[in-house]
Curated annotation (Swiss-Prot):
Domain notes: The presence of a 'disulfide through disulfide knot' structurally defines this protein as a knottin.
PTM field: Cycloviolacin-O13 is a cyclic peptide.
Disulfide bonds: 85-101, 89-103, 94-108
Gene Ontology biological-process entries: defense response; killing of cells of another organism
Name of the protein in its database record: Cycloviolacin-O13
UniProt xrefs under InterPro entries: Cyclotide, Cyclotide_bracelet_CS, Cyclotide_sf
Function, as annotated: Probably participates in a plant defense mechanism. Has hemolytic activity.
Lineage, top ranks: Eukaryota, Viridiplantae, Streptophyta, Embryophyta, Tracheophyta
Keywords annotated in UniProt: Cytolysis, Disulfide bond, Hemolysis, Knottin, Plant defense, Signal
Signal peptide start and end residues: 1-22
PROSITE patterns found in the cross-reference section: CYCLOTIDE (PS51052), CYCLOTIDE_BRACELET (PS60008)
């Protein structure tokens, strides 16, 4: 009987806990940042190039909705780093460097005075 309970507990952990823990290991990026990078890097490119870029981003970073990120930035930012670019740089450098962002305190920011 105890072996059955342990097996059920193991299956539940493997089903629900492990996938959510895996998402914390990845950096994130917003759909708006992806669009800004695509417009800046290849404005006249074909759709295939855009799909390749988006696939590469999805494999390296987790796409997350903008309101969630904005709320987290407002709570944790003191406003001195610049404007958040909608991307983290904990493990992977800022892909949004193409639009003038740089990594500060594990978040990609754009300094409006540098532009």
């Amino acid at each position: 009987m105890d072996a059955k309970k342990m097996f059920v507990a193991l299956v539940l952990i493997a089903t629900f806990a492990l996938p959510s823990l895996a998402t914390f290991e990845k950096d994130f990026i917003t759909p708006e940042t992806i669009q800004a990078i695509l417009k800046k890097s290849a404005p006249l490119s074909n759709i295939m190039l855009e799909e390749d870029v988006i696939n590469a981003l999805l494999k390296s970073k987790t796409v997350i909705s903008n309101p969630i990120i904005e709320e987290a930035f407002l709570k944790n930012s003191n406003g001195l780093n610049g404007i958040p670019c909608g991307e983290s740089c904990v493990w992977i450098p800022c892909i949004s460097a193409a639009i003038g962002c740089s990594c500060k305190s594990k978040v990609c920011y754009r300094n409006s005075l540098d532009n």
